[in-house]
UniProtKB/Swiss-Prot annotation:
Residues 563-585, 606-619 have a biased composition (Basic and acidic residues). Residues 46-157 form the RGS domain. Disulfide bonds: none annotated. GO terms for biological process: negative regulation of signal transduction. This is Regulator of G-protein signaling rgs-6. It comes from Caenorhabditis elegans. Residues 180-191, 494-506, 538-557, 705-715, 724-734 have a biased composition (Polar residues). Keywords: Signal transduction inhibitor. GO terms for molecular function: GTPase activator activity.
Length: 734
């Protein structure tokens, strides 16, 4: 197989060396070894000389930036700089920055390398060590991509030929680089296999030739140099010429003197670099931008990295900020609050004209520049389009149509107040306080200001942490207070009602329930509960017991009821209505807790106990509580009138002599003891005991059946008769 290859190779003794396998592989691709090997090596030397020279590299780098693949060249140059660092700490820091920029998960400029190489680099970085050969394999792959893919496209696009250098110049460059000369063949598609084959000695080779390949390292073929023996040492393999750092020419303001600024940090953005330069020059970092001194165009600080400033003449110029209000087509000055307007904050250089600044915004909001007027906000003073924006600094402009301007003139008002409170603030402080995002559009940068409702809605998110927490706390407290005010109106049945003692209508309505939570008299009467006894019979013992618990405030409230009830006029009722049982009157008491009442099995009570209590309470000399009547309680006066009417209506059935004996036992005490009244008419005795106190006390009201009247024996003795009629039941705790 070496015969066909020998015809194309020069007759040298080296043809019998292990390089025959490499030459055979080259021949299998149909390429001559000597000529192509020499040409490929020379072209690669020329290419490496071009990318290492900043002047020669600038057009090629600009082409890569246009093709969005400049990260490959940046990575190659960064690795060259990484190899020159001897200090371990500095090399580790720089190596970490290279990894974060080109190989990390969220890297800004990822390079196109194979997965195995990327995995090997990641493992090396995670181990904490950054040897000098950390990125050698990746650098070789990127160099191969640049040489055989990007460089030919660059030559075809510019219609230029490859630069030519003499052999002495290339040799001098090889002497400077020492160890970065080209491999014997770059036409092989797998240089790693070729390097591995060269490192294995041939079986029939002399012993002297085994030592030379044994010193080969499993490095990319580009990194090996078979020319010199001393170039095979690891230290000499990594020796290269220092790469010149990136730099730019900077001019300040309108000055013509320039200074060279080194672009040392490749990860820095244009915005950050501009702010640092402004701080160094004593300028306002928030009101400055960098422009190209040759073209006068503004460099986008948000989208471009610091590599875009390399080898360029730059100028650092101040900018001015102002607000423009755009009125929509349906805006009317008669009702300005009905239609919201668009507020835009603009940053531009002082020398730009107002028309040039507004032109891209008018196209953005579909406004015709020919039929629009520019006036100062709140006035009728027009601003010419040729006026420089530096003259309208810190002011607000309004853009409106011709028809709106005519309506504004016809309105007769020379000045109008600002429609948005933010218009009264300084434009320079608006985006500093609210951190609005700016967008670059040519030579201007702008941000759309949200309306007042949106700003107030998200106000707690636009301030710092303590202010946001304080506003959130106030907002929570306001909601809590609103809930408390609404919930405070709801009163459960178990809560005492403070207005129960002052409202006569509530007490007379019959639906008021006491504080104990028991059912009212009206609810029990509506449910059809059977109440035994007479409607005019009241348990005197329980009334006297509960009346002892009446406090002084209850006595004071009683005077109000006394004055009201005395003035109330009772309409005269007919004889039939008077004879009917008054079951609609509902006894009502104060909110004092009722006391339990012991009852006999037959429902009656002993006569000694109420008399004894009445005797005890009668020792005091308080006034007799006569004349105090509550509209919801049967009084003795109503009972007397009913008894007299009944006696006069039936003279035939009554005895010849009607004796009415009224026996009243009144005892006075500090708690107003009850009054007992007994009425006897025509052999029928009706006993009614009513409890009258300073405040309506808890009353146990008992009713008997309307069909059968109660006899005196049933009331006093409690024996005989129908047990249903003689039984007493508790009516209600009212």
């Amino acid at each position: 197989m070496s015969t066909p290859c020998s015809g194309n190779e020069p007759a040298t003794p080296t043809n019998t060396s292990p390089n025959n396998e490499t030459s055979n592989s080259c021949l299998s691709m149909g390429v001559g070894v000597a000529s192509n090997e020499t040409n490929s090596s020379r072209e690669l030397k020329i290419f490496k000389k071009v990318i290492r020279d900043p002047v020669l590299r600038a057009p090629f780098q600009e082409f890569l930036e246009q093709q969005f693949c400049a990260e490959n060249l940046n990575f190659y140059l960064a690795v060259e700089q990484f190899k020159e660092i001897q200090d371990f700490q500095e090399r580790s820091s720089f190596g970490r920055r290279i990894f974060d920029r080109y190989f990390a998960m969220n890297s800004t400029e990822p390079v196109n390398i194979d997965n195995s190489t990327s995995k090997r680099i990641r493992e090396t970085v995670e181990s904490g060590g950054f040897p000098l050969d950390t990125y050698d394999v990746a650098q070789y792959q990127i160099l191969h991509l640049l040489k055989y893919d990007c460089w030919p496209r660059f030559l075809r696009s510019t219609n230029n030929s490859q630069p030519s250098f003499t052999d002495e110049e290339l040799a001098a460059d090889d002497e400077d680089k020492n160890g970065h000369s080209q491999p014997t063949s770059l036409n092989n598609t797998n240089e790693f296999e070729a390097a591995a084959q060269q490192s294995q000695p041939a079986p029939n080779a002399p012993a002297a030739t085994k030592e030379k390949p044994s010193k080969q390292y499993s490095m990319p073929a580009e990194m090996t140099s078979p020319v010199k023996k001393n170039s095979l040492s690891p230290t000499h393999l990594r020796r290269c010429r220092p790469v010149e750092p990136k730099h730019c020419q900077l001019m300040i303001g309108d000055q013509f003197n320039t200074e060279t600024v080194t672009l040392s940090d490749p990860t820095m953005s244009v915005r950050r670099w501009t702010q640092e330069m402004a701080d160094a020059q004593g300028m306002d970092r928030m009101h400055v931008e960098v422009v190209d001194a040759e073209t006068g165009s503004t460099i986008d600080p948000a989208r471009q990295a610091i590599d875009a400033l390399q080898s360029r003449a730059l100028r650092l110029v101040p900018v001015v900020s102002f607000i423009i209000e755009f009125l929509p087509a349906n805006f009317s000055f008669k009702n300005p609050a009905s239609t919201p307007t668009k507020l835009v904050c603009i940053r531009a250089r002082h020398s730009l004209s107002t028309g040039a600044v507004l032109r891209p915004l008018l196209h953005k909001y579909t406004l015709d520049p020919q039929v629009t007027r520019i006036v100062l906000n709140g006035s009728l003073e027009q601003v010419k389009r040729s006026c420089a924006v530096g003259q309208v600094s810190q002011k607000c402009l309004t853009v409106m149509s011709e028809a709106q301007y005519s309506d504004r003139v016809n309105a007769g008002k020379v000045s109008l107040p600002p429609r948005d409170p933010i218009l009264s603030q300084l434009p320079s402080t608006i985006y500093e306080q609210n951190n609005f995002p700016f967008h670059q559009n040519g030579d201007i940068s702008y941000c759309e200001i949200p309306n007042e409702s949106e700003r107030n809605k998200h106000a707690h998110l636009q301030h710092d942490g303590p202010n946001a927490a304080h506003q959130q706390k106030e907002y929570t407290l306001s909601i809590f207070n609103k809930f408390v005010r609404k919930a405070s109106h709801a009163v459960s049945k178990s809560d005492p009602n403070p207005s129960a003692g002052t409202s006569q209508d509530r007490m007379a309505s019959g639906v008021y329930s006491p504080a104990t939570g028991g059912p009212s008299f009206a609810s029990r009467a509506a449910a059809g509960t059977n109440f035994g006894g007479s409607a005019n019979q009241v348990n005197a013992g329980s009334a006297s017991t509960s009346s002892n618990n009446v406090s002084e405030p209850s006595k004071n409230r009683l005077s109000i009821f006394k004055s009201k009830t005395e003035k109330k006029v009772v309409k005269p009722e007919s004889e039939k209505e008077k004879l009917k049982p008054r079951s609609d009157d509902i006894p009502t008491t104060s909110t004092s807790t009722p006391m339990a009442v012991e009852t006999k099995p037959n429902g009656s009570r002993t006569t000694e106990e109420p008399l004894k209590r009445m005797g005890k309470s009668g020792d005091d000399g308080s006034q007799e509580p006569q004349g105090i009547r509550h509209p919801a309680i049967f009084s003795t006066k109503i009972g007397d009138e009913a008894a007299a009417a009944a006696a006069g209506a039936s003279p035939s059935t009554s005895a010849p002599s009607t004796s009415t004996s009224v026996q009243t036992k009144t005892t006075t005490s500090p708690t107003k003891s009850p009054t007992s009244t007994t009425i006897t008419t025509s052999g029928t005795t009706t006993s009614a005991t009513s409890s009258v106190a300073t405040a309506p006390p808890p009353v146990l009201h008992a009713m008997r059946s309307a069909s059968t009247p109660a006899t005196s024996s049933q009331l006093t003795g409690g024996g005989g008769g129908n047990p249903r009629e003689s039984s007493w039941q508790t009516a209600a705790y009212v």
